[in-house]
């Protein structure tokens, strides 16, 4: 899934991957060392390397496409919420608005923190936290994820 997210991101602009294992980073992406203090700190480490508009896109979104990311960026200050109320992606025209509010109910916390618009972009809605989440994706898998799972096109 990370490969699909990076590929879609590179088609739109830069791709930074915050990780403690640089061997998993696909070609073309920049590695940012994960400070090891949770998702909020990881995102802050990545944002420290970005001037201007940033898209924060979780790596467990196998249906993401370049068109979806362009649409998301065009939404301005926006978030893509998962069905469970967590946050799958943030669009930050000004990265300084970021606050580490991830976790259960994070979409509501982000909206309370700043005037985030909630976007309805199907490719950003479904994250894969469990095997059952894959059933929701049907034909929306990216090419790398499809190949990894050996799902026919």
What is the role of each PLM region?
Residues 16, 32, 117-120:
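General small-molecule cofactor/ligand-binding pocket signal
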Residues 1-14:
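A short, N-terminal amphipathic alpha-helix
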Residues 143-153:
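Charge-dense polyanion-binding interfaces
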Residues 61-139:
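Conserved core of the sugar-phosphate nucleotidyltransferase
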Residues 17-24:
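Short, polar loop motifs at secondary-structure junctions
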Residues 14-16, 55:
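A structural signal for isolated positions on well-ordered beta-strands in alpha/beta enzyme cores
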Residues 27-55, 106-109:
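Short phosphate-binding loop-to-helix
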Residues 57-59:
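Active-site acidic Asp-centered loop
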